Amino acid sequence: EFKNMIKFGDIIKHKNKKSLKLVNKNSEFENLAFVVDGEASITIENNVEVAKLKKGDWISEFSFITGDKTSANVISNDIFAISWSKATLQKLKIKKPELFEKLNSLIARNLCEKLIRSNKK
């Protein structure tokens, strides 16, 4: 079913020494993204990296779920991702509720995986 989600998203491809800022800290939720390949860094003040996102991870999922502002920056020099705008996700919730629920399940599973990874550090 995730394949059905792809057609509603936009492609992000970036490979450059200059980092692409995917998320700005303390911003309103704008986009949810899925890392297809590459990686991204989650950073806080003074560009201190607190975590890495890799293939299969979601970007901005906390803000998507809670509606809160973003809690960190996300930057990347090498990433291939699929991104869905807030408006697209709202339409999906109304028009394809079963697909929207699957999306929430995928995100919940990934959050658990991230928690397990962070506990192993």
Q: What are these regions, as identified by a protein language model?
A:
Residues E39-I42, D78, L115:
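Generic short alpha-helical hydrophobic face used as a protein-protein interaction/packing hotspot
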